[in-house]
Amino acid sequence: MSARAPKELRLALPPCLLNRTFASHNASGGSSAGLRSSGAGGGTCITQVGQQLFQSFSSTLVLIVLVTLIFCLLVLSLSTFHIHKRRMKKRKMQRAQEEYERDHCSGSHGGGGLPRAGVQAPTHGKETRLERQPRDSAFCTPSNATSSSSSSSSSPGLLCQGPCAPPPPLPAPTPQGAPAASSCLDTPGEGLLQTVVLS
């Protein structure tokens, strides 16, 4: 263990410092020329140590700068991705809202048109009923005329004494045309019965 420690120290220290320490251990004293040479060697050794320290520090600085740049690039890429994703979500939401509003407006317009058609339909039905009533009355009048003519022809000898009876009143207007037609068809039968009784 003791032998390995000096080896590690020798590897860590620059060669000028190693030579100086080795010379100091070997020779305890020396001439003035040797001291001058050692002083000059000491100055050059300091510059060498400074250069080594600067190189090591610069290399560490370069590594730190590279790591920070990589980290910043990752952060920027992630932030841009999230921002773009949020914008896309907002656009999708806006488009969905616009489509929903369009569908709702078109449905409201279509629903408004249907009740109008339903309101107009009953009026058309009323008009058709009103048109049917005059036709039914027109069909009724010839039957009354035929009944009066048949009564006069069947009993030519009999004359009306006093004022003649008024004609039967017209049936009340009904909402449907079928009952009115049936009532009109029943009137000639009644006239025939009256003529038979008179004869």
Swiss-Prot record:
<keyword id="KW-1133">Transmembrane helix</keyword>
<feature type="compositionally biased region" description="Basic and acidic residues">
    <location>
        <begin position="124"/>
        <end position="135"/>
    </location>
</feature>
<keyword id="KW-0732">Signal</keyword>
<dbReference type="InterPro" id="IPR037670">
    <property type="entry name" value="C11orf87"/>
</dbReference>
<keyword id="KW-0812">Transmembrane</keyword>
<feature type="topological domain" description="Extracellular">
    <location>
        <begin position="24"/>
        <end position="60"/>
    </location>
</feature>
<feature type="compositionally biased region" description="Low complexity">
    <location>
        <begin position="147"/>
        <end position="163"/>
    </location>
</feature>
<feature type="compositionally biased region" description="Pro residues">
    <location>
        <begin position="164"/>
        <end position="176"/>
    </location>
</feature>
<keyword id="KW-0472">Membrane</keyword>
<feature type="region of interest" description="Disordered">
    <location>
        <begin position="93"/>
        <end position="190"/>
    </location>
</feature>
<feature type="transmembrane region" description="Helical">
    <location>
        <begin position="61"/>
        <end position="81"/>
    </location>
</feature>
<feature type="compositionally biased region" description="Basic and acidic residues">
    <location>
        <begin position="95"/>
        <end position="106"/>
    </location>
</feature>
<feature type="glycosylation site" description="N-linked (GlcNAc...) asparagine">
    <location>
        <position position="26"/>
    </location>
</feature>
<feature type="glycosylation site" description="N-linked (GlcNAc...) asparagine">
    <location>
        <position position="19"/>
    </location>
</feature>
<protein>
    <recommendedName>
        <fullName>Uncharacterized protein C11orf87 homolog</fullName>
    </recommendedName>
</protein>
<dbReference type="GO" id="GO:0016020">
    <property type="term" value="C:membrane"/>
</dbReference>
<feature type="topological domain" description="Cytoplasmic">
    <location>
        <begin position="82"/>
        <end position="199"/>
    </location>
</feature>
<feature type="signal peptide">
    <location>
        <begin position="1"/>
        <end position="23"/>
    </location>
</feature>
<keyword id="KW-0325">Glycoprotein</keyword>
